[in-house]
Amino acid sequence: QLMSDFSPPRVSTSFERKVGASLCKASELAMSDKLPKFRLVSAPTGGSKTTSSIALLAMLANEDKGFTGAYICKTIEECEYVYRQLKRLVDPSVLAVYTSLHKHEASPTKLLEKKKELGLEIHDHFDAQDLFSSRLIITTHSRWKKEYDDEVDLGVRKYKGNQRNLFIIDEEPELFSIFP
């Protein structure tokens, strides 16, 4: 279903299928009882990491009603893209996206700026509390990192008080900075 979004629609390449298989295996290992819990899938830009990740989350959420996951993006634009794709593949009631532009009190000025600058139109808005009660969430690196830095529960790592089953962190997050 995701492949039909391309213009013209196309089938996945052998390389993209291998990336998808690697992502599935890494996710399986990350969710298993084996340590370490972190797995990395590296592929060049356009290698289908994002598309495979979206498809995997959708499949897991649709097949296992107890599955919970978080997709962590670098930018608001990426969050909106992932949200739109997942919204087509899963029951929207299990899904929430939360960024400064997805919250109900988002600045109309900022929304207009992003529309003019990037053609980004955000129509669905959520409360921060929606992260705690949604099986699948999408948010930014900064919110995910804030949970660790401030030692607070912002609904990213946990669903209804329990650790989420799977976290997909798209792109390399800046986990620390070095200042001169």
What do the PLM-derived regions correspond to, one by one?
Residues 50-52, 59, 66-90, 94-104, ...:
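Conserved Walker A/P-loop ATP-binding site and its immediately adjacent core
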Residues 68, 133-137, 163-166:
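Loop/turn-to-beta-strand initiation segments
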Residues 141-180:
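Signature of the SF2 helicase/ATPase Hel1-core->accessory helical subdomain module
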Residues 43-45, 74-76, 139-143, 171-172:
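Structural motif
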Residues 90-148:
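Inter-Walker segment of RecA-like/P-loop motor cores
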Residues 62-64, 128-131, 158-161:
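Conserved catalytic network of the ASCE P-loop NTPase/AAA+ motor domain
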Residues 1-33:
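Pre-P-loop entry segment of helicase/translocase ATPase cores
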Residues 34-55:
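Walker A/P-loop
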